[in-house]
Every structure is written in C-alpha cells, then in structure tokens.
A protein has these predicted regions:
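Histidine- and acidic-residue-rich, metal-dependent catalytic cores
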Residues: 1-226
C-alpha cells in the first residue's frame, strides 16, 4: 500500500549514490559536471529499483519525483508540485534529515534552522507534511533549553500554536519572561536547541506564578542546627 511504498522509498531513495565518488559525498556546491555525475548515479539507482520491484512502479516514482523536486529547488528552479503526496512527504523528511545529520567536513544545521528552512519555502515543501513533522518531533516542547540570536540562553515555557518557532521563554540571565510571538519581540528568535541544561540559573517561581504559570516547587527539608 501507499505507506509501505513510502517506507521503501525512504530506505532506498539514494541507493544509486553507493557508487558516488568519495570527493562528492556530502558536497553541496556542485559544478555542472558533478551534477551530471550525481544525476547518472541516481538514474542507475532508479534502474535498480525497476529490477527489484518488477510490476510495481510506485517506489521508483516516489524516489524520482522527490529527487527532481529537491534538485530543481537547489538549481533555482520552481519545482513542479504536481507530484504524489508520498513524494512531498519524503521531500520534507529527506531535507530535514540531510540538514540535521552529521556530514563530513561540515557541522549539521540545528533542528530549529532546519524547520525554519522548511517553513520558509512552502512553494517546495508541502505545508501539511511540514506540520506533521513538527507535531511528531516536538521540537520546542516546554522545558527545552534554547539559544536566542542575542546570545542569551532561555527555557521554553509554553508553545505558540500560531508559530512553533516563537514560544514563550524564560531568560536564564534575569528570569524575565519573553513572548517571542509578540510584535515587539520580532527581532528575537531561537537559533538553536541547547543539548545540555544549564543548571546555574535560578528560576523566580513567584514571577512565573504572577504570569499565570503553574509551578511545582521542590520540598525543602530543614536541617537541624549542629
């Protein structure tokens, strides 16, 4: 069925690149000759899929449509979105995976930057597929530590249903609460997710309560003198 076809396509879409020259692996800025080599490798992969899935063209079709959609966008062309839903879903998943995965010679993009890229190009990446990805990975769930573009560190307090990248956050430096969804804060944005929690901050629980947030305070134990 369609779901199985998407799964197979996701696993096999780059099978043709197994023979890709080492110097082209992970390279983004390709010249025309290198693009031709990559196209030939992909075409060989599609021929392999034809041989493996005799009589079933769905896997090859999804892979080919996804490849052409992303490739046209990279070449500055407007992709033809008259492609299958499965190919649209895979284009979103593949782009997110490629941007956030470890790559030889360069650092991966943050999850935030990858989602921002997908949201910024609705002419390429299907909005429903992008939203499904956001819903599945819970990228900025409450409790997530983040870095802002002003170098400040903050903690996500509540989600923004209108824009997942602009939640309400708590600034670690001064315990101020910042609603990134407000127009007055439009110059601030999250640029990365912190992988480790900074335990050096002190949270002002009273300030949170005044803003209407429910705070579970730790139980303190009195230590007898002496």
């Amino acid at each position: 069925d369609e779901q199985h076809s998407v799964i197979r396509a996701a696993l096999l879409h780059d099978i043709g690149q197994l023979r890709l020259p080492r110097e082209l692996i992970g390279k983004n800025d390709l010249n025309e000759e290198e693009k031709r080599v990559l196209d030939n490798m992909q075409a060989e992969g599609f021929r392999i899929l034809d041989q493996v899935y005799t009589g079933d063209t769905s896997v090859k079709r999804i892979c080919a449509q996804c490849y052409r959609c992303i490739r046209d966008f990279q070449d500055g062309k407007r992709p033809d979105l008259r492609i299958s839903t499965e190919a649209r879903v895979m284009a979103v998943a593949q782009t997110y995976d490629q941007m956030t995965a470890m790559q030889f010679g360069q650092n991966p993009a943050s999850e935030v930057m990858a989602i921002k890229h997908l949201l910024d190009h609705p002419e390429v990446y299907d909005a429903n597929a992008v939203q499904a990805l956001i819903d599945s990975i819970h990228i900025l769930a409450p409790g997530t530590s983040v870095e802002l573009n002003n170098k400040e560190k903050a903690l996500v307090l509540t989600l923004n249903p209108e824009n997942v990248l602009r939640p309400v956050v708590l600034n670690f430096r001064d315990n101020s609460i910042i609603d990134l969804g407000l127009r007055g804060n439009r110059e601030l944005e999250i640029i990365d997710i912190m992988k480790t929690m900074d335990n050096r901050h002190v949270m002002d629980t009273e300030a949170l309560k005044r803003q209407g947030f429910q705070v579970e305070e730790p139980k303190y134990v009195e230590v007898p003198p002496g």
